[in-house]
Amino acid sequence: VGTGIIEAAICIANGLIIHGVLVENPDGFVEVLVLWFAAQIVMLLVDLVYNKITSYDIHEEIKKNNVAAGIGYAGAIIALANLVRHGVEMHAESWIGVAQNLGVETGLGLLLLPAARFMTDKILLPGRSLTDEIVNQETPNIGAAVIEAFGYIGGSVLICLSFG
């Protein structure tokens, strides 16, 4: 089930990215492909960052069928895809402008992903640890994972709104 949740998040992420690419480039097939490919490369960074900010290996937890770990990771995927969508969707006069938009949005997202996890851990789950709730229990806490996922997604929405 955890793998299915991640697959669903990847589908949602691709939908967000394709939407963002097509909004500003409805007629340019080459531009659409280049931006989509660049966005896919950026999305690979989610895996690296997420594994660094958690004290557990997401891939091992998914192999153990830890649904809660899959939910948290899915939230991170969707959050960064939302930022990538907004970065490529913003109007720019040149490829350099699009790259700058994408870089700023993605950079902020990758920097704030750990901050969102920390704030979720300390503010929304006081006295508890997300890691303990998600991986160190006999039955992983799906509710804590949903809170983590929405912390990431909510943070990405706030970043997008701050850039108009």
Whereabouts are the PLM-identified features?
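Alpha-helical transmembrane segments with an aromatic anchor "belt"
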Residues: V1, S55-G72
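Select subsegments of transmembrane alpha-helices in polytopic membrane proteins
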Residues: T3-I12, A69-L80, G143-G154
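Membrane-embedded alpha-helical segments in integral membrane proteins
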Residues: N14-E24, V84-G87, C160
